[in-house]
A protein has these predicted regions:
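Hydrophobic transmembrane alpha-helices
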Residues: 1-75, 79
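Transmembrane alpha-helix/helix-exit interface in multi-pass inner-membrane proteins
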Residues: 78-97, 121, 125
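Membrane-interface interhelical connector segments
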Residues: 88-112
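Internal alpha-helical transmembrane segments of multi-pass membrane proteins
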Residues: 138-157
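Hydrophobic transmembrane alpha-helical segments of multi-pass transport and channel proteins
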Residues: 153, 157, 185-197
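Interfacial helix-loop-helix junctions of multi-pass membrane proteins
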Residues: 165-175
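Membrane-helix cytosolic exit motif
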Residues: 190-211
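Short, highly charged, low-complexity non-transmembrane loops/tails of multi-pass membrane proteins
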Residues: 206-230
């Protein structure tokens, strides 16, 4: 019998699990509003940027193809979480259950918000991976810090530009939307910069353990190929 070689390493699997956990956790934390002096944010900001850091690590070590796999896996698990949460929220509670309001606040994500979140996540994540991948080729693998920060700016920028108009247009004053977008991009980029030493250490250690340092010279970045993980 011929033994089939696995295409995914244990370490990549661990990265994938952490990526999915971060996305799902961010969904739950989004229901809490946090005040930071002169600006208000959602609790999801605490953990969501971690998904972009993992995206950067995955793209840097394993390349754009594995980054696409990571993104689609995260999207699928996030969708299942939201779908089952919405289903449980729609089913009437037991007569003695008196916490429907609290449960709905966490799992009753409005369809518009959910749709905006899914679209923004896909676009932002693919932009982040694309910028990271192309810059690695153009720089011959140098300047990881610069590439990680710039890919986050573009990725988070695309995410916010898509999410806030889709989710909040007509709900908040139109003039407030640019403020939401800019503040989210700035805060998430600052987050990336703060944890950059950790990101660099993780990337170096992962490359050493995996014996991988992918360059995407033969990758097709067309829209149709983005839908593939091959």
């Amino acid at each position: 019998m011929t033994e089939k070689k696995n295409n995914v390493s244990v370490l990549f699997l661990l990265f994938s699990v952490l990526f999915c956990v971060c996305l799902i956790t961010a969904n739950v934390l989004e229901t809490k509003q946090i005040s930071l002096g002169f600006i208000n944010i959602t609790g999801g900001l605490l953990v969501f940027p971690v998904s972009y850091i993992i995206n950067d690590c995955g793209c840097e070590v394993w390349g754009d193809r594995k980054a696409r796999l990571l993104i689609w896996l995260g999207f699928a698990m996030n969708f299942l979480f939201v779908a089952f949460g919405a289903l449980a929220d729609a089913i009437p509670g037991a007569p003695y259950w008196d916490n429907d309001e609290g449960f709905h606040a966490v799992f009753g994500l409005a369809p518009r918000i959910a749709a905006a979140s899914f679209v923004a996540f896909l676009i932002g994540s693919f932009v982040n991976a694309y910028v990271m991948s192309r810059m690695k080729i153009n720089s011959n693998g140098k300047n990881f810090s610069y590439r990680a920060i710039l890919s986050t700016v573009f990725g988070e920028g695309a995410d916010s530009i898509v999410f806030f108009p889709l989710a909040l247009y007509g709900v908040v004053p139109t003039k407030e939307l640019p403020i939401f977008i800019i503040s989210q991009v700035v805060l998430k980029t600052v987050y990336e910069i703060i944890v950059l030493p950790v990101t660099i250490a993780v990337v170096k250690k992962t490359k050493k353990l995996e014996g991988e340092d992918a360059y995407d010279n033969d990758v097709d970045y067309s829209v149709w190929k983005i839908l593939s993980v091959n």
